[in-house]
Amino acid sequence: MKKNFSAIIAVIFAVGAALYAQTTEQGKQDALFLYNSGRFEEAIKICQKEIEQNPNRVDSYVVMCWSLVRSRQYAEAELRANAGLLVSPYDLRLIEILGEARFYLGKNNGAMEQFQKYIAAAPENGARVGTAYYFMGELYVRKARYLHADIALSAAVRKEPLLERWWVRLGYAREMAKNYRGSLSAYDEALRLNPSSADAQNGRTRVASLLQ
């Protein structure tokens, strides 16, 4: 009888643990689903609850920070990313999103440091490598270091060649560096991707007049 009772208790605990794991995994999926659906505030609330239940749940910090940046809550994103990095100091997702938060806060040196860390550690096919190069390019533009911006933005468009906005910014960096032919080429590519891009058309007109 005691053996049967012990077996029943063991089964109850096993089922409970399985249900808890399933609920936890479902919570992660729900938060990520909400983020991917553009429902950032809802995703943030779910992640907050998950972190309250388990402060070491790194995925919750990641999805929360992504959602905070997308909802333009940059100071909170910086705070949460730093908290997540205390739990997992080498998580590349947190390293990169902290760079984005600092970029939008105008913390140029801190942002650059994060993107450089990410590029140094991420594999060539890392999910955010192109994005990190793009932000580095924008940071160099802010500092009027246009040759460096050209290098970073060129790397960005090699990784993700279908983003018209990135080609426009590459055209602008080259224009400021007085590389007019290279600038014209970048603006032309932006217009090929999006013929209605006013920024690309205006940039191309400026550069073409300088080449005459």
Residue ranges and their predicted role:
Residues 36-37, 70-71, 104-105, 138, ...:
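Register position in tetratricopeptide repeats
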Residues 25-54, 66, 70, 138:
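Alpha-helical segment of the N-proximal tetratricopeptide repeat
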Residues 49-50, 83-84, 117-118, 122, ...:
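Canonical positions in the second alpha-helix
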Residues 63-66, 97, 131, 135, ...:
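Canonical tetratricopeptide repeat
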Residues 23-24, 58-59, 92-93, 126-130, ...:
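Helix-start (N-cap) detector for alpha-helical repeat units in TPR-like alpha-solenoids
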Residues 53, 87-88, 121-125, 159, ...:
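Structural marker of alpha-solenoid helical repeat scaffolds
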